[in-house]
Amino acid sequence: MRVAVDGMGGDHSPSAVVKGCVQALEEFKDIEIYITGPEDILKEAFSKFKYDKERVTFIDAKEVISTNEHPAMAVKKKKDSSLVKALRLVKDNQCEAVISAGSTGAFLTGCTLIVGRIKGVERPALAPVMPGKNGPFMIIDAGANVDSKPSYLVQFAKMGEVYFKSVMDVNNPKVGLVNIGEEEEKGNDLTKATYKLLKEERDINFIGNVEPREVSTGDVDVLVCDGFVGNTVLKMYEGVASTILSMIKSEVKSSFLAKLGVPFLAPALMNLKKKMDYKEYGGAPFLGVKGICVKAHGSSDAKAFKNAIRQARKFHENDLIGKLSEEITKKSFDNQKNI
């Protein structure tokens, strides 16, 4: 499998990106890395490690898209940027996947404009998988579409369902609609209309509305919402998780007795920290485009990049894009028959 990596994306590029690539090459013997960015800088970063040189290709790119640039304008103007060149590798079928920790807006825009949407997809969606009390869950959309229509959200539900079936091996994923109350009549015009449509979908296991306080239980596999709500839920969830871990650390240091208990609690605390660590999940897939596109966290370190590559590899092994295309095409055909 060939993976395109934006070598200059993220807060800690290129060092963290390169180190993550080296770790991935060591762990996964069936991958090749195509890394984009200033060739001299990238080669210098790689020279600090031992790696299989036959499995790394450097794609020279002189420009970098920053987070404060207008996404669409930057993608269209900076054709020699590390991000655009990485996306082009997927567009031209030179790579099966692309990973970037750079500007989220530019990445999502570039995926849509360059890689292109799967036929029948109205809007691609950002779909991070998060740790929950009883298992992982997906938030879709987590920021790609701030303004949405009911038909978009129904398609998000279908894409999330396909993901859980093919990647997570869940036979009948439970789909919920994020709302301010469980009752059908609760919410705004968007959620009310979406509820009715999802209720009519016979091939989606729709369980109804899900209140934000129930999001983290993991009892629902796919949480559907517009990008504004999804991004808010995602960032609040990350913030609360970080705060809880910090509070536990402070309490442990607060007294002598608490410190005495650390050896007994350490395994459980380490396990909790691992479950809540975004680095373990690598990145969020951008579902609905023709290639495997993974958005890594902006502050990703080497471990996060390695896991983003692991994630992309798993998507490829499970033919996620092929299954999404098949389901969307089937759904579009069924809709035409019913017109």
From Swiss-Prot:
Per the record, the major location class is: cytoplasm
Q: Does the keyword Transferase apply?
A: yes
Q: In which pathway does it act?
A: Lipid metabolism; phospholipid metabolism
One GO CC annotation? cytoplasm
Q: Which Gene3D superfamilies match?
A: Isopropylmalate Dehydrogenase (3.40.718.10)
Q: Which GO terms describe its biological process?
A: fatty acid biosynthetic process; phospholipid biosynthetic process
Q: Which domain of life is it from?
A: Bacteria
Q: According to its UniProt record, which reaction does this protein catalyse?
A: a fatty acyl-[ACP] + phosphate = an acyl phosphate + holo-[ACP]
Q: List the GO molecular function terms.
A: phosphate:acyl-[acyl carrier protein] acyltransferase activity
Its keywords, alphabetically, are: Cytoplasm, Lipid biosynthesis, Lipid metabolism, Phospholipid biosynthesis, Phospholipid metabolism, Transferase
Subcellular localization, as worded in the UniProt entry: Cytoplasm
UniProt key word Cytoplasm: yes
- According to its UniProt record, what is one Pfam family this protein matches? FA_synthesis
Give the EC number(s) under which this enzyme is classified: 2.3.1.274
Q: Which family does it belong to?
A: Belongs to the PlsX family.
* HAMAP family in the cross-refs: PlsX
State the function annotated in the UniProt record. Catalyzes the reversible formation of acyl-phosphate (acyl-PO(4)) from acyl-[acyl-carrier-protein] (acyl-ACP). This enzyme utilizes acyl-ACP as fatty acyl donor, but not acyl-CoA.
Q: Which NCBIfam families match?
A: plsX
Oligomeric state and interaction partners are given as:
Homodimer. Probably interacts with PlsY.
Q: What is this protein called?
A: Putative phosphate acyltransferase
Species assigned in the record: Clostridium perfringens (strain 13 / Type A)
Primary gene name: plsX
